Design a protein with these regions (language model features):
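C-terminal His-loop and adjacent cap/lid subdomain of alpha/beta-hydrolase
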Residues: 12-17, 26-442
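C-terminal motif of bacterial Sec signal peptides marking the signal peptidase cleavage site
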Residues: 8-10
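Sec-dependent signal peptide recognition
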Residues: 1-4
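Extracellular calcium-associated, cysteine-rich motifs in secreted modular proteins
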Residues: 22-24
């Protein structure tokens, strides 16, 4: 029923011209925004700096992805009265951040008085000229997927300060481009362009994060689905913003596998999103195998104070068959090869949790409910024609990290061990590609 609810929720609001007001329970409502200076919102502007040559923080500076950090000067600020310590910030469209169809972009924070910080990148599809299934609005309040639930005892990040980054521009948090719309059905509705502002949105959220949580000891950068893919480039910018923190990257269902041998696919996405210029000059060969995983290699090699987790099912239906349109066995082959290379090169800093679930096609394990993919409040989801509805409903499975286990350890406990850098408990765990009879399929 969860999967049916997710699909119906998306389809019910798939018209990008449709807005839904909130209700008495505190959901978001359309209202006129009142912008104030950062000072009035108890924030401060970001001051760009030039990092030391050869430092990990220098990577983002040299790649040119820091350009939006000092552009944010005003926000519309609101306090979520339902939950203590939670606030939201909406940004001025003129300063860069926005959703794909021109709606406002917002982030939410939770202050728990912690020395640790969770940055969570929401999932929600992707949109390019050949395929578009994407969320196109950003909620102003923080949802409650498992990873953001401060009351869930098993949540290893429950006590962390948190920043929630909605996802609404279809560019995997990497875009910086405006592309003319080429879908006749959307042109008929007056939608003439796709605005990719993932980098500006990510930057705006990090400005808020830095202002409120200036010097955390540990930063967990986590993302699910599109947010998982988003962590790959976001890690560079997060390191620039927090040069001294332990950086713990948790990639859930967006581990960097794409189309094996099809470099043109990756290049097309980068070009359309306007992100090709952010690829480091000495990483020009990073995508020759058709995957994005070499960029993870590039980053970890240059940032010894970062470690990363790859969490996925063997046959993730949403990534393999829906978005990549590749055979699930080809996906599993590439997943095995690409992640093995990373683990063998960084055995203590890159580890996997590859599970089976009920069907082996599960998608995401940090969420447990759809709010981590589509947010809450006014939602707009653009759906492509010809989607295999039966396949989607039959294969979509949102796992729960407090219940999913391999052997004796749950994913939640495994992630807790990762935070503590307990290399014994944070093992490299993979179930067989086909579950054994009466065995633990994860």
């Amino acid at each position: 029923m969860l999967f049916l609810a997710l699909f119906l929720f998306a389809c019910g609001e798939s018209d990008p011209d449709t807005n839904h007001d909130g209700d008495e329970n505190g959901e978001d409502k359309e209202e006129e925004l009142v912008f104030v200076s950062l000072d009035e919102a108890r924030l401060s502007g970001f001051e760009l700096y030039e990092p030391t040559e050869g430092s990990a923080a220098r990577l983002a500076f040299d790649a040119g992805i820091t350009s939006y950090l000092d552009k944010i000067t005003k926000v519309a600020h609101h306090i979520d009265e339902r939950y203590e310590g939670e606030e939201g910030f909406t940004f001025d469209l003129a300063e860069g951040p926005q959703c794909m169809r021109g709606d406002d972009f917002s982030v939410s924070i939770r202050d728990r008085g912690s020395k640790d910080l969770l940055l969570f990148l929401q999932g929600g599809g992707a949109c390019w000229s050949d395929f578009c299934l994407a969320v196109t609005k950003a909620p102003t309040n923080m949802p409650r997927p498992l990873v953001l639930d401060p009351e869930l005892e098993a949540n290893p990040y429950a006590s962390f300060n948190a920043v929630y980054f909605p996802y609404c521009d279809g560019s995997l948090f990497a875009g910086d481009n405006i592309v003319p719309e080429d879908d006749p059905a959307k042109l008929e509705k007056g939608l003439t362009e796709r605005v990719y502002r993932g980098l500006a949105n990510l930057s705006a959220g990090l400005v808020v994060a830095k202002a409120r949580f200036e010097d955390p000891e540990r930063v967990v950068l986590a993302g699910s689905s599109a947010g998982g893919y988003g962590t790959i480039l976001a890690a560079f910018l997060v390191r620039y913003v927090y040069p001294d923190a332990e950086l713990i990257i948790v990639n859930d269902a967006g581990v960097g596998v794409a189309k094996d041998g099809e470099v043109e696919f990756v290049e097309k996405l980068l070009t359309e999103f306007g992100a090709e210029r952010f690829v480091p000059e000495d990483c020009a060969e990073c995508f020759v195998n058709g995957h994005i995983t070499p960029l993870i290699d590039y980053f970890l090699e240059r940032d010894p104070n970062a470690r990363a987790a790859a969490i996925t099912s063997w046959y993730d239906y949403i990534i393999s068959e829906l978005f990549m349109e590749i055979d699930k066995d080809d996906f599993a082959d590439a997943l095995d090869i690409e992640t093995t290379k990373l683990h063998e090169k960084f055995p203590d800093r890159y580890r996997r949790f590859i599970y089976w679930g009920e069907k082996g096609t599960g998608h995401t394990a940090l969420l447990g409910n759809p709010s981590g993919l589509i947010g809450t409040g006014p939602i707009a989801v653009e759906m492509p024609g010809g989607v295999n509805v039966a396949g989607l409903l039959n294969n979509l499975e949102l796992l729960k990290f407090n219940e999913l286990s391999i052997g004796e350890i749950t994913l939640a406990a495994w992630l807790g061990a990762m935070v503590e850098n307990d290399l014994d408990a944070w093992g490299d765990l993979m179930v067989p590609r086909e579950p054994e009879e009466d065995g633990d399929g994860g």
